[in-house]
Amino acid sequence: MAKFRLSLVQFLVSPVKSDNLNKACKLIKEAAQKGAQIVALPECFNSPYGTKYFPEYAEKIPGESTELLSQVAKECGIYLIGGSIPEEDSGKFYNTCAVFGPDGTLLVKHRKIHLFDIDVPGKIRFQESETLSPGDSFSVFDTPYCKVGVGICYDMRFAELAQIYANKGCQLLVYPGAFNMTTGPAHWELLQRARALDNQVYVATASPARDEKASYVAWGHSTVVSPWGEVIAKAGFEETVISADIDLQYLAEIREQIPIRRQRRDNLYTVEEKKN
């Protein structure tokens, strides 16, 4: 299939987990009814984002939130990239994205590899590592349309991860993310366009909607970028669902016109996966 429809769900996350789950399911179904074949949710879609919230809202996988995602993926017959949730496993906490197939099967469980530890004086300090542990594996899944690579938010800053995914054959990279009011306007779109251009892939980001009253204010602006580096769909900061047609023939044409994959000097440099 040369084209398929991707939808990104952007909504306000509340402190009430059941409300978040109900809203997510409602918007997923709306996207599917409008033709979406792959749907992605935001980072931390079932809980407020913050180190104090992660242990309180954490679940095992499978658990309440992921069981519901499995059901709605099966009901809608879609591939569902389940944003992320705080996950608890053996006394450790992770920021984890669960991906489900059209039959409700868990395809991939991506634990955020690069933890969001930053300190911008006078603007923002955040240390995910105060409560979270990093993941240590790559997350790729197959669809009838193309191969998809998954990262979470801060993972997008690391060009090596995107290149490894592209080398594995991914044509679409999806990053549920929640950039803030400092890094969002400066880097959110720039990073997506860079990753798309570097690797000649489609890049999509799904953010929570902006809640000015939250302790952590998300930038919003869920986005889809083409392998030409062009923004082809972009949300504002409010609740919405955006969609884009992912055109794999267009991707193939770009790779043929500017054949950087054949022109890399592997005799001089390489980015490769370490075997655990």
From Swiss-Prot:
This is Omega-amidase NIT2-B. The keyword Transferase does not apply. Residues 4-248 form the CN hydrolase domain. Has omega-amidase activity. The role of omega-amidase is to remove potentially toxic intermediates by converting 2-oxoglutaramate and 2-oxosuccinamate to biologically useful 2-oxoglutarate and oxaloacetate, respectively. It comes from the Eukaryota. GO terms for molecular function: 2-oxoglutaramate amidase activity; omega-amidase activity. It holds the Pfam family CN_hydrolase. Its main location: cytoplasm. The active site is at 43 (proton acceptor), 112 (proton donor), 153 (nucleophile). It is found in: Cytoplasm. GO terms for cellular component: mitochondrion. Homodimer. It comes from Xenopus laevis (African clawed frog). Its EC number is 3.5.1.3. Belongs to the carbon-nitrogen hydrolase superfamily. NIT1/NIT2 family. Keywords: Cytoplasm, Hydrolase. It catalyses: 2-oxoglutaramate + H2O = 2-oxoglutarate + NH4(+); 2-oxosuccinamate + H2O = oxaloacetate + NH4(+). The keyword Transferase does not apply. InterPro entries: C-N_Hydrolase, C-N_Hydrolase_sf, Nit1/2_C-N_Hydrolase. One of its GO terms (biological process) is asparagine metabolic process.
